[in-house]
């Protein structure tokens, strides 16, 4: 008997979630898990957005880059409902995942945005894994890489208006954090 079954609820978006599903199909192929697909056409509306100042807003927008799963222990029959939030923005959260899931694994994880969320929500959110902040200690010509990274991001954020210096500072801080 295979000890675990995962129910994969069909996602609203496949571009980001394909590597999660591919991994599950491979685990099934190896006989490590049983995998069942459940068709889900549910809209899953609702986003919770945390601003840089900590203000929380809710919208009725869909959060299609969040995929949902159920893990079943076939021995003791316990179940865990979880989601993988593969959205690019660390400050956007799926309302449905926060309300209904036991665990949420977030690709763009930043604990600073979690601090503002209610305790029952923030205790559910974990980093997805090696998706950001991964680097080699053997960085050949690292100064070129860092300069190119900085210049391309300054170019993207450059807009001559009253927030120019604020954006440039944010870019420098962000790139330094990602580099370290």
What are these regions (language model features)?
Residues 75-180:
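Catalytic core of nucleotide-activated saccharide and alditol-phosphate transferases
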Residues 1-89:
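N-terminal pre-catalytic "stem/leader" segment of glycosyltransferase-like enzymes
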């Amino acid at each position: 008997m295979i000890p675990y079954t995962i129910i994969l609820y069909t996602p609203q978006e496949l571009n980001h979630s394909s590597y999660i599903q591919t991994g599950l199909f491979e685990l099934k192929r190896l006989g490590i898990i049983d995998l069942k697909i459940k068709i889900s056409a549910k809209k899953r509306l609702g986003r919770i957005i945390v601003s840089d100042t900590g203000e929380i807003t809710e919208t009725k927008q869909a959060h299609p880059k969040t995929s949902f799963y159920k893990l079943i222990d076939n021995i003791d029959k316990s179940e865990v409902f979880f989601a993988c939030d593969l959205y690019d923005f660390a400050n956007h959260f799926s309302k449905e995942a926060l309300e209904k899931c036991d665990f949420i694994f977030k690709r763009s994880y930043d604990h600073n945005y979690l601090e503002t969320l209610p305790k029952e929500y923030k205790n559910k959110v974990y980093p997805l894994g090696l998706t950001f902040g991964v680097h080699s200690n053997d960085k050949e010509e690292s100064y070129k890489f860092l300069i190119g990274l900085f210049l391309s991001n300054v170019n993207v954020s450059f807009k001559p208006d009253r927030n120019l210096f604020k954006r440039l500072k944010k870019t420098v801080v962000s790139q330094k954090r990602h580099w370290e």
